[in-house]
A protein has these predicted regions:
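Positively charged n-region of N-terminal signal peptides that target proteins for export
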Residues: 1-7
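Sec-dependent signal peptide hydrophobic core
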Residues: 8-12
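C-terminal motif of bacterial Sec signal peptides marking the signal peptidase cleavage site
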Residues: 16-19
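Short, conserved catalytic or interaction motifs in soluble domains
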Residues: 22
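Edge beta-strand at a domain terminus
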Residues: 25-29, 80-91, 123-144
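N-terminal helix-cap/turn-to-beta initiation motif at the start of protein domains
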Residues: 26-45
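Contiguous, well-ordered beta-strand patches that form the walls/edges
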Residues: 50-55, 66-119, 123-126
C-alpha cells in the first residue's frame, strides 16, 4: 500500500512538471530575457504596408522599445505611445511554426511576437490562434 501511494505521488509530480514549461505569462529570468531579446535586436519594417505609410518596430539591448510610423511622402516620423518604453518577454501560446512570446510593453500592453523564416510577426489579439498570424504577411516585419 505504501509503495502504491509513493508511486502515485511520483507520477503526479512528474505529470505536473511535464506541463510546467507551457504556462503562458510565466516570468522568465534575465538570462532567458536576453537570449530572446537577441533574436529581435534591431529595427524591423512592416512588410505589407500602404503606399503612404510604414510601421517600424525596434528592440534594443537595454530593453527599450522603438515604434513609429513613417509617412512615406513627407518623411514625417510619428512615434507611437510606447516608443522608448521598457519591455520584457513572457511565455506565449503554442504555435506549430515557431516559438511565440508575449511582449509586455511598459508593464501594460501585451502583444504576441514570433520570429519565423527570418521575419518578425506581431499581433495583439488575445486568445487567438498563433498559426493564423505567423506566416501571414499582414503581421510581418523584415529587418531594416
Amino acid at each position: 500500500m505504501f509503495v502504491m501511494r509513493k508511486l502515485i505521488f511520483l507520477l503526479s509530480a512528474l505529470l505536473l512538471c511535464a506541463g510546467c514549461d507551457k504556462n503562458e505569462g510565466e516570468p522568465l529570468d534575465m538570462a532567458e530575457q536576453t537570449r530572446i531579446n537577441n533574436q529581435f535586436l534591431g529595427l524591423w519594417q512592416e512588410v505589407d504596408h500602404p503606399r503612404h505609410q510604414c510601421k517600424y518596430r525596434g528592440f534594443h539591448s537595454n530593453f527599450k522599445y522603438t515604434s513609429f510610423l513613417l509617412m512615406l511622402h513627407s518623411g514625417d516620423k510619428l512615434p507611437s505611445t510606447y516608443d522608448g518604453k521598457p519591455y520584457h518577454f513572457e511565455k506565449g501560446p503554442e504555435c506549430s511554426k515557431g516559438t511565440v512570446y508575449t511582449l509586455v510593453l511598459d508593464n501594460r500592453l501585451k502583444e504576441f511576437i514570433c520570429k519565423y523564416n527570418g521575419l518578425l510577426y506581431m499581433w495583439w489579439q488575445e486568445n487567438s490562434d498563433p498559426d493564423k498570424y505567423v506566416g501571414n504577411p499582414d503581421y510581418a516585419y523584415e529587418r531594416n
